[in-house]
Amino acid sequence: MKVLRLGFTDKYIEKQEPIDVVFDKYQPLGYVAVVELPSRIPWIIEIQRREWIERFITMPRDIFRELSFDIIILRRKLEPTPQYRMIRDIVSDLRQSRGYASGMVILPNGLTYDGDLLEGIEVMEGVDVIAYTLGLIDF
């Protein structure tokens, strides 16, 4: 079991403190982590490759401070697609399958794109991880 500390700031959390991310299980699909937020249900974070875990947790903390969402979820790898696929389509798939109303995409290289400004942005099929932040959701 490996515990990583993420400095994540969220306007919906009264006590803004680091969140424990526990990587306690490995499956062929990738690492699985359960993140529990105060007064929120646990969310499962799936990660395809270990190197993306290390790259993700070393992203500038300013990125986390600027995002006003509940939690970050890394997507599981989608079914085989053409060599290039619009990020907008991936976001659309996530919204339809998970019921997300809004959000932002964070690419593995740390670049961020608003969900409504994805025209013309393409990502190769080989990209394993896209972080997706939740908007307001009623549980």
Curated annotation (Swiss-Prot):
GO terms for cellular component: viral capsid. It is found in: Virion. Keywords: Capsid protein, Virion. This is Coat protein TP2. It comes from Thermoproteus tenax virus 1 (strain KRA1) (TTV1). The lineage of its organism: Viruses, Adnaviria, Zilligvirae, Taleaviricota, Tokiviricetes.
